[in-house]
Amino acid sequence: MAHLINFFKSKFSREKYENELEMVKNEDNPKRLSYIARHNVFPKVRLEAVSRISDESVLADIAKNDSNKNVRRAAIEKISDVSVLTDISRNDSNSSVRVMANNRLMDLGYE
């Protein structure tokens, strides 16, 4: 019985993920994209939302606060604010995120 429950639970989650990912790909409203990027439970959905956001303040918030390092890294790639990147390069809990922020600073001509 437990296997059957897990099967349906897994199928529901997969369908929910696929629906939400498709929704983000078709979303044009910056406020909705910002909300999705900050609050969706699926990291890949948040990644897709981040890829469609250009507001640096939203990206900075995500780069500093998202629970998933890959989402933070995606936001960093789009940030040009030196103070935000410096803060992340010094303080992020993940070394690969710190390195990426430092590399982004170098790409922008800061060392």
Regions found by a protein language model. Give the residues of each.
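Alpha-helical scaffold segments
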Residues: 1-111
